């Protein structure tokens, strides 16, 4: 573990952090789209039904 810093001699830190940021953003988008596609976790329809703005599609 004491020589773990040498990993940055193999990988460019800027590219690693950019790739990590892109991966985390795409993961967050995917999770949100999955949640919006389920009826029990779709906060848009739940909010609309709560305030009687739009009829919820069954």
Swiss-Prot record:
Binding site residues for a bacteriochlorophyll: 32
Looking up SUPFAM superfamilies in the UniProt record yields: Light-harvesting complex subunits
What are the annotated GO cellular component locations?
organelle inner membrane; plasma membrane; plasma membrane light-harvesting complex
What stretches pass through the bilayer? 16-36
Name the job this protein performs.
Antenna complexes are light-harvesting systems, which transfer the excitation energy to the reaction centers.
Cellular localization per UniProt: Cell inner membrane
Oligomer status and interactors: The core complex is formed by different alpha and beta chains, binding bacteriochlorophyll molecules, and arranged most probably in tetrameric structures disposed around the reaction center. The non-pigmented gamma chains may constitute additional components.
* GO terms classed as biological process: photosynthesis, light reaction
User: What name has this protein been given in UniProt?
Assistant: Light-harvesting protein B-875 alpha chain
InterPro entries on file: Antenna_a/b (IPR000066), Antenna_alpha (IPR018332), Antenna_alpha_CS (IPR002361), Light-harvesting_complex (IPR035889)
Q: Which family does it belong to?
A: Belongs to the antenna complex alpha subunit family.
PROSITE patterns, per database record = ANTENNA_COMP_ALPHA
Statement: the UniProt record of this protein carries the keyword Nucleus? no
Q: Which GO terms describe its molecular function?
A: bacteriochlorophyll binding; electron transporter, transferring electrons within the cyclic electron transport pathway of photosynthesis activity; metal ion binding
| Residues in the Cytoplasmic compartment per record | 1-15
Instruction: Kindly report every residue range on the membrane side named Periplasmic.
Output: 37-58
Coiled-coil boundaries: none
Q: According to the UniProt entry, which residues carry N-formylmethionine?
A: 1
| Matches recorded under NCBIfam families | pufA_517_ASD
Membrane topology summary: Single-pass type II membrane protein
Task: Write out the entry's keywords from A to Z.
Answer: Antenna complex, Bacteriochlorophyll, Cell inner membrane, Cell membrane, Chlorophyll, Chromophore, Formylation, Light-harvesting polypeptide, Magnesium, Membrane, Metal-binding, Transmembrane, Transmembrane helix
């Amino acid at each position: 573990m004491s020589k773990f810093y040498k990993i940055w001699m193999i990988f460019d830190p800027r590219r690693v952090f950019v790739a990590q940021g892109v991966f985390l953003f795409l993961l967050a988008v995917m999770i949100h789209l999955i949640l919006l596609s389920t009826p029990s976790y779709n906060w848009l329809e739940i909010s609309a039904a709560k305030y009687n703005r739009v009829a919820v599609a069954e």
